[in-house]
Structures are given as structure tokens and as C-alpha cells.
């Protein structure tokens, strides 16, 4: 699911501090 993938990206982005990834 695309939503699940986006949530995962957001989680990883928050962890590594790459918020620009989800933006």
C-alpha cells in the first residue's frame, strides 16, 4: 500500500532527521 510506504518513509525520515524526504 502506498500509504503504508509513506508512513514508513516518514518514520525513517523522522529518525534520521531528513524531514525533507517526506516533503
UniProtKB/Swiss-Prot annotation:
Catalyses which reaction(s): a 1,2-diacyl-sn-glycero-3-phosphocholine + H2O = a 1-acyl-sn-glycero-3-phosphocholine + a fatty acid + H(+)
Catalytic class of the enzyme: hydrolase
Lineage of source species: Eukaryota, Metazoa, Chordata, Craniata, Vertebrata
Cofactor(s) this protein requires: Ca(2+)
GO biological process: lipid catabolic process
EC identifiers of the protein: 3.1.1.4
Organism: Crotalus viridis viridis
Tissue: Expressed by the venom gland.
One CC-aspect GO term: extracellular region
Subcellular location: Secreted
GO molecular function: metal ion binding; phospholipase A2 activity; toxin activity
Protein name: Acidic phospholipase A2 Cvv-E6c
Amino acid at each position: 500500500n502506498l500509504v503504508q510506504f509513506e508512513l514508513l518513509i516518514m518514520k525513517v525520515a523522522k529518525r534520521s532527521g531528513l524531514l525533507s524526504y517526506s516533503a
